[in-house]
Amino acid sequence: MRLSPDTVAAERDWVRDRTPVVTLINDVRSDLGATFGVEVAPVSEADYRAEVDAVFADGDLAVNVAALVALLRDLDVEDDYPGFVVDELLGRELAGMIAGTQPLRLLGEATFHYADVSHHPEAEREGGAEPAEPAGVDDLEAALAAGFQTRLPGWDWTDGDSPFAVE
């Protein structure tokens, strides 16, 4: 793999245009909100795109996010199962990277596993048709959903200053 500013821009454009991820973000937010008994604000496509732009505006973060996106977009292992650990590892890392610094990073990583388990695009194919995309793409979508849902506003506990800040 060769990364350049043009490659990073191309991966940003792919992520930015992957707006069906917004549905997964909102499904995850709704499920987690119900689990924890809280209301979580939904995310719009405009919110998602703006946050993608924010992630890719940080060059050091952008090149690493772009590398993981490119790897997952192309990852396909014959019979898939042997590649299960690889796509989980890359997806978890991508979700954490997008989510931000601790504790958001850990929440993004944990949320990746939830999003991944609940996201089954292969089940949506008709008549057992072959997948249109490599196996890593569903993990990529779960990682994008987990990372961006974690970093975007909408969770009450992230509004305002922490009560644990010491002045």
PLM ranges: what are they?
Residues 6, 73-76, 104-106, 140, ...:
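Alpha-helical protein-protein interaction elements
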Residues 111-167:
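Glycine-rich, aromatic-bearing surface loops/beta-hairpins
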Residues 18, 95-104, 129-137:
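Short, structured coil/loop segments at alpha-helix boundaries
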